[in-house]
Amino acid sequence: MYIDTGIMSNNIFLFAFFALVGLTRIEAMPTKGSEGTWDVDYEDQEHTGITCRENEHYNSTRIECEDECNDRNNKLCYRFQQFCWCNEGYIRNSSHICVKLEDCLKDEEQKSETLASSANNDSSKRLEDDLKLFSHDSVSHTSLEPETQAQKFNGIINEETLDLVFGKPENSWAENKPLETKTQAQKFNGIINEETLDLVFGKPENSWAENKPLETETQAQKFNGIINEETLDLVFGKPENSWAENKPLETKTQAQKFNGIINEETLDLVFGKPENSWAENKPLETKTQAQKFNGIINEETLDLVFGKPENSWAENKPLETKTQTQKFNGIIDQYTRSIVFVF
């Protein structure tokens, strides 16, 4: 059998060449040392000047992308030190450090808990702000409520309960402020005083009283200034079985609260009953009028203010304008009263 020595020598040469290349590749591959660490490819490291960190090894042949905790789709390639690869059982976290796989999962759970806690805190703060917005302390005055409010106090209507309904302004001139409608009270945030009453009921020019009694100029003008039983009934309404043709200045709704019965008992509930009052049904007076007589309100002082004609249908005629008083230069006696209040 003839063997071509030339071909054989060529084959031996090729075999020796590939064997040498194979040994070089084996020498270049990293070898695993102690647990979790790798021997470094010192030859290539010296050539490139790259030093891998803890839990990393050098891999000069790396061509694929490396996984990390928050990117498992191998889309982010070569974003860290080139050719440094996490050791087996390790993975890069968000801080670019190689950590154990279980530590990576814990890190993700902590992130989720932090985000959830932050969202809950934001929600709780918004709820707390909403509660503060509608808290009782943020309301300066209690607004007037419907009839239900009166029922809250078992039907007792006095200074205390009215203050709860309408609100009590500081330095209030009247302990028992007049009963106003819900809309009127709300216009002034529950403050019922000389200024707000003038805004509600109107203030005539050169008024002798800073607080005009509870009648608007329009109502007085409707009847050419004549204020008597007939005109008052037209303005305020006349309940059936009324004990007084000239009922106090109440609205229809207020009168209906007591089934149209207006007497000593119901008026005391509405207006309050002052001590040593000469009359259980005290008319609505202004602060100025009361001060004229040092706070003494009795038959004599009221006659001086309102006048008392003989056979008068009302002993204390309310609703007198300054104009009537001014006609006589402020002199109110039997003669002037007879001209004002026709006997």
Curated annotation (Swiss-Prot):
<dbReference type="Pfam" id="PF01826">
    <property type="entry name" value="TIL"/>
</dbReference>
<dbReference type="GO" id="GO:0052170">
    <property type="term" value="P:symbiont-mediated suppression of host innate immune response"/>
</dbReference>
<keyword id="KW-0945">Host-virus interaction</keyword>
<feature type="signal peptide">
    <location>
        <begin position="1"/>
        <end position="28"/>
    </location>
</feature>
<comment type="subunit">
    <text>Interacts with host PAP1, PAP3 and SPH2.</text>
</comment>
<keyword id="KW-0899">Viral immunoevasion</keyword>
<dbReference type="InterPro" id="IPR036084">
    <property type="entry name" value="Ser_inhib-like_sf"/>
</dbReference>
<protein>
    <recommendedName>
        <fullName>Protease inhibitor Egf1.5a</fullName>
    </recommendedName>
</protein>
<comment type="function">
    <text>Counteracts the host humoral immune response by inhibiting the processing and the amidolytic activity of host PAP1 and PAP3. Thereby, melanization of host hemolymph, normally producing several reactive intermediates toxic for viruses, is deregulated and proper immune response cannot occur.</text>
</comment>
<feature type="domain" description="TIL">
    <location>
        <begin position="52"/>
        <end position="104"/>
    </location>
</feature>
<dbReference type="InterPro" id="IPR002919">
    <property type="entry name" value="TIL_dom"/>
</dbReference>
<comment type="similarity">
    <text>Belongs to the polydnaviridae EGF-like motif protein family.</text>
</comment>
<keyword id="KW-0732">Signal</keyword>
<keyword id="KW-1090">Inhibition of host innate immune response by virus</keyword>
